[in-house]
Amino acid sequence: MPVDQSFNAPLSEVDPEIAAVLEQELGRQRGTLEMIASENFVPRAVLQSQGSVLTNKYAEGYPGRRYYGGCEFVDVAEQLAIDRAKSLFGAEFANVQPHSGATANAAVLAAIAQPGDMILGLELAHGGHLTHGMKLNFSGKLYDAAAYGVDPDTFLIDMDVVREKALAHRPQVIIAGWSAYPRHLDFAAFRSIADEVGAKLWVDMAHFAGLVAAGVHPSPVPYADVVSSTVHKTLAGPRSGVILSRDTALAKKLNSAVFPGQQGGPLMHVIAAKATAFKIAATEEFADRQRRTIQGAQILAERLVAADSTEAGVSVLTGGTDVHLVLADLRNSPIDGKQAEDALHEVGITVNRNSVPFDPRPPMVTSGVRIGTSALATRGFGETEFTEVADIIAETLKPDSDLAALRARVLTLTDGFPLYEGLTQ
């Protein structure tokens, strides 16, 4: 009996509704400026790896130790991903199987803590992450969570306060990492505090892993017991997670925490795409992109602290940035975070509203916006383009701005930097 006709038919014939969604989304990405700090554009080679026949293969276990036959080629793919991750970050151990950053984080905690243990991380409302102890998240339900925050005047993490919190709570795990904090973390100070209270130090570098890979951001690997990350964001790989460590003694616990602790079969097509992304991240081209990413964020921060923005009630948390994102503070502005997000969307710039520390507004409204530059650097933007983008954003955040004229300026930029040329879906 021949294969069903639908087996070899193109998506446009089998499922025109989904084909239309893909085409529309491609058009949206091409015709707008993507500035959500947790998003990026993956290289075409990563798309090709992920959209491959490896999606067909079940491979529970690890290379050379599978519970299924026929794994000789997916073993090669996973070992490449492991070796490349270790080389890229200078780690002794890597697990590339986590389906996401959240599952990687769940596995880390399962490996280095017991349910009911005390964990200490950055307060969610001050830039932390759900998986660092938020009460409605697994991390706040399974573990006893405490938090440190930022200084109310500088909005910086005060390591003396972190030490005081650690001495008061005596956590088994101290978490260094963030989802909305624009400065470097002092990994050496975190290490010292962890040692003082006998805690494990876990660094979640999901947002800045690409910067670390490029050597333009301090690496947490020499200081942390365990490092976790997503592979998208600044790394520009597939949406997924990775766990790293310099301590090979933790290898068995970490591997067991991922499989069978958190997951069953790994997604081999995604793991292959991770391997491709790690290879690209080791290139000078990638390093240049990360340098432009930081340059773009700093240009934006400088523009938003200029006199006209200040007069419009806009400021920048911490006064600038060391990384790929800027946090615009709108507490003194006539517009709130939701209104700013909507106005920027109208001109063709995609960002997300974001709470600022000590925010008087609710989380669905907020008094800030988080703006990232990774995707634009990937698209090829440099100093000239980022200067124009910064000016467009500054103008958009003013009351009564001409949004139609600003939209035209955005289209000039997108037209000059085509995305995924030749791709139709």
From Swiss-Prot:
Pfam families: SHMT. It catalyses: (6R)-5,10-methylene-5,6,7,8-tetrahydrofolate + glycine + H2O = (6S)-5,6,7,8-tetrahydrofolate + L-serine. CDD domains: SHMT (cd00378). Keywords: Amino-acid biosynthesis, Cytoplasm, One-carbon metabolism, Pyridoxal phosphate, Transferase. Pathway: One-carbon metabolism; tetrahydrofolate interconversion; Amino-acid biosynthesis; glycine biosynthesis; glycine from L-serine: step 1/1. One of its GO terms (cellular component) is cytosol. GO terms for molecular function: glycine hydroxymethyltransferase activity; pyridoxal phosphate binding. The modification N6-(pyridoxal phosphate)lysine is found at residue 233. Its EC number is 2.1.2.1. (6S)-5,6,7,8-tetrahydrofolate binds at residues 124, 128-130. It is found in: Cytoplasm. Belongs to the SHMT family. Catalyzes the reversible interconversion of serine and glycine with tetrahydrofolate (THF) serving as the one-carbon carrier. This reaction serves as the major source of one-carbon groups required for the biosynthesis of purines, thymidylate, methionine, and other important biomolecules. Also exhibits THF-independent aldolase activity toward beta-hydroxyamino acids, producing glycine and aldehydes, via a retro-aldol mechanism. NCBIfam families: PRK00011.1. This is Serine hydroxymethyltransferase. The lineage of its organism: Bacteria, Bacillati, Actinomycetota, Actinomycetes, Micrococcales. The gene is glyA.
